[in-house]
Amino acid sequence: MSLLLAGLTVLMIGDSHMSTPGYLITTLHDDLKKDGAHVYSYGACGTPSGAWMEAIRPPCGSAFRLDDGPLRVRPSEAGFTKPLPELVKLHHPDLIVVINGDTMGGYKDPAISKSWVRDEVKRLTDGIKASGAACVWVGPAWGSEGGKYGKTFAKAKAMSEYLEQIVSPCTYIDSLKMSKPGEWPTIPGDGQHFTDAGYVSWGSGIEHAIVTSDILQKIKH
């Protein structure tokens, strides 16, 4: 239980790391619930951050979990996600947690498309500003090299460092500080998505970063 999180409403939105049972929509959601928060989680696989400002059909499915309710997974053809303004009106969050980095990393490309990433991030952070909620932005974890998405430790580091520069007013959570490169096991041949044990460790690390950050001190209870 966290005295600072207890009773707060947390809205979590993210990419593929929030779209499958056993991923962060399971582990981090559970950790924040144990801290006494009301948690509403939504994942949209394969979508950049700016896509949360409109209703979209995620290319590889979506998922949602409403506080104590069950985790619901939807294939891409099942319909559209709810945009952030609608989610804010529905849940009235005190804190918005954004988990989006790998999807925009373009790890197979020679370099990060910085202007595109900046535009995507700004589109979402502008929406978060308008909501009046506090915000944290969770950057990518190390993963492993040699997977099908082209992720390498150097590219994960470059993406994390760039996101940290551009996600204001959100407080940046650097996932790379939570483990050593390759420490958390990924799905064989994947390199980007973790095994259950990896998501347990990542969820715990994010939860610790949230409850020990200054941002909770600024939220009125």
Language model: regions and residue ranges:
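Hydrophobic alpha-helical targeting segments used for export or membrane insertion
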Residues: 1-9
